């Protein structure tokens, strides 16, 4: 592969390159459902819920970055400490040409893997996929300054949109960090791994970061911090939705509530209405009543038994290779290899 050639398959014809910047976009634009229809579809469900990606407007992304620095929120620093300690072992176990990060953001944690790739193989390709263009630009600029041996080709898309664009002729390590998998319900879990497995070649690997089942007090503190940043983050979604669809959620009449659901092994994050509100959607001429003390589920964060998860992913032809964890066994990095057909 030539130095300036993108790591995309024939489907790269559906992409366009932004002013020679090594960031690619879908030619026909990202496939987006009308946000009003998307929001109404889930709010008319019983129980009511929202799709978690609405959390990440500019303010939401800023709040989440602050949450990651909180003493109660152990996930980010624990995962990065594992990566820092084991990156060389991961790259040695997964000899690939290309690293594709799904939902990369600024790709800060992945730099440990890229540095190990340079140390062991002198060069390589990094292809982050993310819906955040500013995050991709930050990642590209960091890569240019600190990792010039790595060829950078970012893709501005949702990862499921980007799967089909990755060249199967390249040996690839797919990276999915941050326990983002924990935000998936059962249907999303199956859909994600079905699509990912189809996109992988027989010499490809997956590195998966997941939060583990642990003491309930530790879990609940991580999602109910003393500064109230998580509450602000969750309730901010309604300000975002108000701007998107011209609805009238009143943030002054709601509060945040979270708890650990033992049966489903997940933290559940809700907005609870403190007074009855008529929520209107003027562009559709419809409304619903959000009654006092009724809840809307905004996000879940599932926790995992790593051994059980390894067995589940065999169904998607992903075989376990290595398991890395921290001294407290709070978080796991799981390395899988795609089985040959």
Language-model segments: residues:
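A short glycine-rich, Lys/Arg-flanked "PGG" loop and its adjoining helix->strand segment in the class I
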Residues: 190-202
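Conserved beta-strand signature within the Rossmann-like core of class I S-adenosyl-L-methionine
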Residues: 199-213
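Conserved SAM/SAH-binding beta-strand->alpha-helix loop
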Residues: 129-133
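Conserved SAM-binding loop of SAM-dependent methyltransferases across substrates and taxa
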Residues: 106-121
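Conserved class I S-adenosyl-L-methionine
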Residues: 96-105
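N-terminal auxiliary segments of SAM/dcSAM-dependent transferases
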Residues: 2-54, 61
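Class I SAM-dependent methyltransferase Rossmann-like catalytic core
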Residues: 47-94
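Substrate-binding/catalytic lobe of Class I Rossmann-like enzymes that use SAM or dcSAM, i.e.
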Residues: 220-306, 310-318
């Amino acid at each position: 592969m030539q130095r300036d050639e993108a790591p995309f398959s024939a489907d790269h014809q559906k992409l366009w390159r932004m002013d020679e910047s090594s960031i690619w976009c879908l030619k026909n634009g990202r496939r987006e459902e009308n946000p009003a229809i998307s929001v109404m579809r889930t709010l008319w469900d019983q129980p009511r819920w929202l799709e978690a990606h609405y959390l990440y407007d500019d303010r939401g992304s800023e709040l989440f970055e602050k949450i990651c620095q909180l003493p109660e929120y152990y996930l980010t620093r624990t995962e990065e400490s594992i990566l820092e300690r084991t990156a060389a072992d991961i790259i040695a176990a997964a000899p690939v040409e290309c690293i594709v990060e799904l939902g990369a953001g600024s790709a800060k944690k992945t730099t440990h893997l890229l540095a190990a790739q340079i140390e062991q193989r002198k060069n390589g390709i990094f292809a982050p996929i993310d819906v955040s263009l500013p995050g991709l630009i930050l990642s590209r600029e960091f890569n240019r300054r600190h990792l010039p041996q790595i060829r950078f080709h970012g893709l501005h898309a949702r990862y499921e949109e980007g799967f089909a664009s990755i060249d199967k002729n390249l040996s690839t390590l797919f990276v999915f960090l941050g326990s983002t998998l924990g935000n998936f319900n059962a249907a999303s879990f199956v859909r994600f791994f079905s699509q990912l497995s189809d996109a992988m070649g027989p010499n490809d690997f997956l590195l998966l970061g997941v939060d583990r089942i642990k003491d309930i007090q530790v879990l609940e503190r991580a999602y109910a911090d003393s500064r109230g940043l998580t509450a602000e983050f969750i309730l901010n979604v309604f300000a975002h939705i108000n701007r998107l669809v011209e609805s009238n959620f009143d943030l002054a009449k709601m509060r945040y509530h979270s708890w650990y659901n033992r049966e489903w092994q997940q933290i559940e994050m809700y907005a609870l209405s403190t007074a009855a509100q008529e929520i209107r959607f003027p562009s559709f001429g419809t409304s619903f009543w959000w009654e006092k003390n009724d809840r809307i589920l905004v996000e879940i964060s599932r926790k995992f038994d790593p051994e059980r998860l390894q067995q589940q992913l065999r169904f998607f032809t992903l075989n376990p290779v290595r398991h890395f964890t921290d001294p407290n066994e709070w978080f796991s990095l799981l390395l899988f290899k795609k089985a040959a057909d």
